[in-house]
């Protein structure tokens, strides 16, 4: 039995798409368990670059089962647009290789409208949402007024729930935000058509995933975003609306914790963040710009420039602790090549006291000053390295120190964007 989690150990954008794609080679099933089409990752295979947002990365392989779990919020329009995009790239998506949970909640047009309107209303206190309707959909889920995929398969149930929701949503949209109301008939027609298209893909994914694990198949659970965007343990309120830590697999895919055998945290060799919120190691100078351009740090979904800084092992230690990580996969080592001195944050100075954890209060985190260790950099390109021994000596010293500081082994090192730019150091 083998069921393992792949998730982001920082603020997202760590290279999960590439690493999930690589690890999916040895998996039979790939499962998304939280988030929605607000996630964005790029996978490069030979001369093609695939940009995925919702469909699991295993779709790029033949004979893999890909699952959109119950913890995902599903925008059916976005899903079928991605299906068509993949077909245009030569990737077939069928009910045989993509299964959608009947319990997943649906993102509705009013969710997207409310997402954008509430963000605009916040003004300078905006969160930095992608505007995809993720948060409002999870809000309805928590309020128990959400509409699920299974409702689409029962048109009369869907119509009644849509009518009830629209009465409230239209009141908010028109009276609070001064926007035009949504038309019931238009949404009804559009979504019932989606229901017909979705029907062949819809199953009870919990039963399928459970049986696959029980029968000895390898199941990979693919996280979206990153540990510090977790709704409970991230840098709240600048977080996403779901549980992105390892434990989120259990409710998001409906399996028990004892079925998980390992968890791999994906981390860049430096740190990036999109949007607002404290960022202790952020570099607001030429070095930050250099890392951004060398690593092409711009969002797949939004195109926004990412904030860049030195590696923060306080963040990685927290990820290892709260997600039960058994190893790290380090990406973007190649981006640091050519830098004379490389720094790593080993702790924070908080009002004169050294701490090695992330305070819950953002006001306290903003007062934390990074305590650095400095390392000699490496001029050699690492792109041609295909084994750990072929890496530059200083790069290996850098990675070894990360293992010591986080008390977690590094199982994989990525030296470039393509599948073959991957070095397996140990078993995951």
From Swiss-Prot:
Homodimer. Keywords: Cytoplasm, GTP-binding, Ligase, Magnesium, Metal-binding, Nucleotide-binding, Purine biosynthesis. The keyword Ligase applies. Mg(2+) binds at residues 13, 40. Plays an important role in the de novo pathway of purine nucleotide biosynthesis. Catalyzes the first committed step in the biosynthesis of AMP from IMP. This is Adenylosuccinate synthetase. It comes from Clostridium acetobutylicum (strain ATCC 824 / DSM 792 / JCM 1419 / IAM 19013 / LMG 5710 / NBRC 13948 / NRRL B-527 / VKM B-1787 / 2291 / W). GO terms for molecular function: adenylosuccinate synthase activity; GTP binding; magnesium ion binding. SMART domains: Adenylsucc_synt. The keyword Transmembrane helix does not apply. One of its GO terms (cellular component) is cytoplasm. Binds 1 Mg(2+) ion per subunit. Its EC number is 6.3.4.4. InterPro entries: Adenylosuccin_syn_GTP-bd, Adenylosuccin_syn_Lys_AS, Adenylosuccinate_synth_dom1, Adenylosuccinate_synth_dom2, Adenylosuccinate_synth_dom3, Adenylosuccinate_synthetase, P-loop_NTPase. It catalyses: IMP + L-aspartate + GTP = N(6)-(1,2-dicarboxyethyl)-AMP + GDP + phosphate + 2 H(+). Pfam families: Adenylsucc_synt (PF00709).
